[in-house]
Amino acid sequence: MRTAVFGGSFDPPHNGHLALSLFARELAGLDRLIVSVSKNPFKAAADASDDDRSAMARLLVAEINVAGVFAEISGWELQQSGPSYTIDLLRHVEERCPGDELVLLVGEDSYLQMPQWKFASEILKHCTIAVFGRSDIDAADAPPSDPLLPAIHYDFDMPVSATKIRRLAAAGQPIGQFVPSSIAQYIAEHKLYSA
């Protein structure tokens, strides 16, 4: 079975995450997608609570599964007492899904930071890396394929970011074009990202 791991803070999950998941399923021939909500060691703190981010990620998974059940959510990283790194998550998924071929889905922004990740060189022993390019990443910043972190690169142009969504929500602007309706409703009902 080919299982993809898609980790992130999902603060909030948005249409880019949804489209990437569906795109990856078709292009990478995935059988299962594990959406893992995490604490980002490179960010000071999330704007929404762990519970809210998990709830929104569950809504994202429901949206992904409308096209056919293959996604599930994992809260394993949030349950860890200290920082959880990608290598830890991959080892956990290997234990849970023995024999599966693992694919790590990352955006180009994350891929560019990978050399700074803990145990970056170990990651390749556990998975294939699938990188999804973003139009808002300057090509001059993108190194050629890192020989130490080879990856499969996919062109993926979905110009939406969680930062932009949080700013719009804080300013009382509509966000419905950037997030699935279930997530927009959750954000409004729970008054997330309000100033």
UniProtKB/Swiss-Prot annotation:
InterPro entries named among the record's database cross-references: Cyt_trans-like, NadD/NMNAT, Rossmann-like_a/b/a_fold
Catalyses which reaction(s): nicotinate beta-D-ribonucleotide + ATP + H(+) = deamido-NAD(+) + diphosphate
Tagged with keyword Protease: no
Keyword Transport: no
Membership in a protein family: Belongs to the NadD family.
UniProt-listed HAMAP family: NaMN_adenylyltr
Name the record gives this protein: Probable nicotinate-nucleotide adenylyltransferase
